[in-house]
């Protein structure tokens, strides 16, 4: 199983390499990459099964973010796992935001990686056959409300603007927190911004 790790933190590289080796991946199949240019070349030549990327490698440069977005789109059979660069927050979950793009905390447990990668590790197969989890999506109301919430508007302001009861706003906030698997507003904002950066945003259910 060809794998690429793009993370400037040596501890993370060591941890991921150790995890992959312990799950039977051969050392020669694990490649460390440092730049977006190198990642594009490696993805084209190696067609990796999984790519781990720390968002710090691209998030501060708009052109790098655009290139990462393009690389993800060009390789639908590669699973991209993007680690959030968010400090001092207890969050060890992961979210599938596109069929081949997963946003994860760096605190993800080995057991969770097993759940995600288990079948890919066992068989030389494409990820599309095996990722058995729902893609994160919001209703139109949740999406609109989340944008207002992120713009700093409170429950009463949102209630007035959307012409819905404050209790309904609170209920929608509860749904968003459940879908993004956290009650931490900082994590929610981070997930939204990162998803906006490498995709066209969180899926909105238009029904």
Curated annotation (Swiss-Prot):
Alphabetized UniProt keyword annotations: Activator, Capsule biogenesis/degradation, DNA-binding, Sensory transduction, Transcription, Transcription regulation
Modified how: Degraded by the Lon and the HslUV proteases. Interaction with RcsB protects RcsA from degradation.
Transmembrane segments: none
Ranges where the HTH luxR-type domain occurs: 131-196
DNA-binding found in the keyword field: yes
DNA-binding region: 155-174
GO biological process: DNA-templated transcription; negative regulation of DNA-templated transcription; positive regulation of DNA-templated transcription; regulation of bacterial-type flagellum-dependent cell motility; regulation of capsule organization
GO CC terms of this entry: transcription regulator complex
Subunit composition and interactions: Interacts with RcsB.
Function summary: Component of the Rcs signaling system, which controls transcription of numerous genes. Binds, with RcsB, to the RcsAB box to regulate expression of genes involved in colanic acid capsule synthesis.
Recorded family membership: Belongs to the RcsA family.
Descriptive protein name: Transcriptional regulatory protein RcsA
Source taxonomy: Bacteria, Pseudomonadati, Pseudomonadota, Gammaproteobacteria, Enterobacterales
Gene from which the chain derives: rcsA
